[in-house]
């Protein structure tokens, strides 16, 4: 089972023109086993098949590396990380990053804490809070080179969660599909309100999956009133 897992992982990762060393492959296998075990107790993922998890969680997360490879990135925040996607796969791939995982559900925090021990990852901070609260905290506000938020909310909502964390000159990496790209394009006014500018769109294809990344550069400080109080961005989204 383990060797089959690693073989599939290698094949799928190679479609991104990336490669993993044996230790990285082992860590992804341990991640997979922990995910399967904990998923019996709490709802971490609806995916069950080995290849499906490899492709739609691990490889999809690693695809985020492509748009940022030439950027000077040290600190990353993964907002609404859930079971650790995409932050932990990125950290496994390159341990130089200092990673903050933000999650509002306590049961998922417990999984992440256990997972970090299993994978023996350093420079990983796990924070139990909401983005609307943490984005006001001076220890986190505008402190990150890169913010990620995978499948958290619609673009005009997730932008309000994410951009306050990004330092001037840093990046929020929006993750779109052909089906929702228009929502990102319609949210460009919100990008500007929050201090960002969409620099480029990068399309990546692997295993019949298309991902479109929007590299949003932080060019101005986010106005102090954002993010608004918990729940408000979702109830009253900033209009495109």
UniProtKB/Swiss-Prot annotation:
It is found in: Cytoplasm. It comes from the Bacteria. GO terms for molecular function: rRNA (guanine-N7-)-methyltransferase activity. Pfam families: GidB (PF02527). S-adenosyl-L-methionine binds at residues 80, 85, 131-132, 150. Its EC number is 2.1.1.-. GO terms for cellular component: cytosol. Disulfide bonds: none annotated. This is Ribosomal RNA small subunit methyltransferase G. It comes from Dictyoglomus thermophilum (strain ATCC 35947 / DSM 3960 / H-6-12). The lineage of its organism: Bacteria, Pseudomonadati, Dictyoglomota, Dictyoglomia, Dictyoglomales. The gene is rsmG.
